[in-house]
Amino acid sequence: MKITWLGHSAFRIETGKAKILLDPFLNHNASFAGQDINDVSSGITHILLTHGHGDHVGDTVALAKETGAVVLANADLAAWLGSKGVDRIEMGNTGGTITLGGFSATFTNALHSSAQITEDGVSHALGNANGLMLHFDDEASIFAMGDTDIFSDMGLINELHQPDIGFVPVGDRFTMGGAVAALACQRYFSFKTAIPCHFGTFPIIDQTADKFIDGMEGSKTQVKALKPAESLSI
């Protein structure tokens, strides 16, 4: 398995059976600058979305049309994507699991909102915000928390799924900050590896993952604070 952080909450995940983009906010992502969208979307089989905000949906519509990738999203967001011409969609909702050729995705809770803002400035709700629990055939498992605060049922998610790797939002203001994210990882999860995300993209969120790294000091979990475009092989 090869995991590449594309900046913000966008990741490319490559396994022997799937090539996945998670929350592909690319073209307007300052952390993505200097990377080639054609390279990172090459050969993708699936696009996975945690929720409907623009900094997570990002370039999904264009990429889905260009590549023919299957898009996974909650039911309300899936309906919106369909209205934009995306025709290969797998929809689900909190608690549901979908098998997708080489891996499965389970929608979990996340404490956040989910919406798109139209040109008139009105926010239109698009279902629940979710985390995504990804189980791969003969590979490490990943829990992409999505945008969230800490909540005690994270412990139940860990009990049910025992994820090996966590994608953890740490930027504060719109998600939990680094210190709280470290508490969440140490109290509720038994990750082998934690990868911080959702930081450094906008001036009003934390610019580094330092608070998370400091909070994880002494933990059995290995923290991998990747740079944009940096990859980790598992």
From Swiss-Prot:
InterPro entries associated with the record: Metallo-B-lactamas, RibonucZ/Hydroxyglut_hydro, UPF0173, UPF0173_UPF0282_UlaG_hydrolase
Classification via CDD domains: metallo-hydrolase-like_MBL-fold (cd06262)
Pfam families xref list: Lactamase_B_2
Transmembrane intervals: none
Keyword Hydrolase: yes
Keywords recorded for this protein, A-Z: Hydrolase
Molecular function via GO: hydrolase activity
Keyword Hydrolase: yes
Protein family per UniProt: Belongs to the UPF0173 family.
Protein name as annotated: UPF0173 metal-dependent hydrolase RHECIAT_CH0001941
Annotated source species: Rhizobium etli (strain CIAT 652)
